[in-house]
């Protein structure tokens, strides 16, 4: 477990969505304020806008890896970023117990009833009891931390390991 994993777990328990929790856990290393990290990732929660599509925590992984590795000045960088994201998705599928990156599938696998609509659910003890989300936030942040540590090549200068 990483300090970012613990932080992502804590952010989720404070009421932030899954994507916000993962990105905010890396805000210091990315040179972002917490507010910027939370705003940047707000719409990706609950499977992107609560549509229960791609897991919001995994969207946080994509956001963090993009901030660390993407080079918008290099036209060939898209292919490299796509490969990095696909590697991360493969690792997430293998480690999340659901074999998926789809929010509704991960919720269903955990026995939670995936609901749609735009209204965020109230965060109660029962909500946390039936959701895999806090642990998935931890897993995604751990996955990012491990990935970044294992792939120092290609990182851009603004990533601060010690922050």
Please place each PLM-identified region on the residue numbering.
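Glycine/serine-rich anion-binding loops at beta->alpha junctions
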Residues: 16, 44-63
């Amino acid at each position: 477990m990483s300090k970012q994993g613990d932080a992502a777990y804590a952010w989720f328990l404070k009421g932030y969505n899954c994507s916000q929790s993962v990105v905010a856990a890396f805000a210091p290393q990315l040179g972002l304020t917490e507010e910027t990290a939370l705003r940047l990732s707000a719409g990706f929660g609950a499977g992107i806008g609560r549509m229960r599509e791609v897991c919001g925590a995994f969207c946080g992984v994509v956001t963090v890896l993009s901030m660390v590795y993407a080079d918008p000045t290099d036209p060939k960088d898209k292919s490299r970023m796509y490969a990095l994201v696909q590697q991360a998705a493969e690792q997430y599928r293998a480690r999340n117990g659901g074999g998926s990156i789809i929010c509704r599938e991960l919720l269903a696998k955990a026995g939670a009833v995936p609901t749609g609509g735009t209204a965020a659910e109230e965060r109660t003890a029962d909500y946390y009891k039936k959701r895999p989300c806090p642990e998935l936030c931890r897993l995604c942040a751990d996955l990012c931390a491990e990935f970044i540590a294992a792939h120092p090549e290609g990182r851009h200068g603004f990533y601060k390991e010690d922050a």
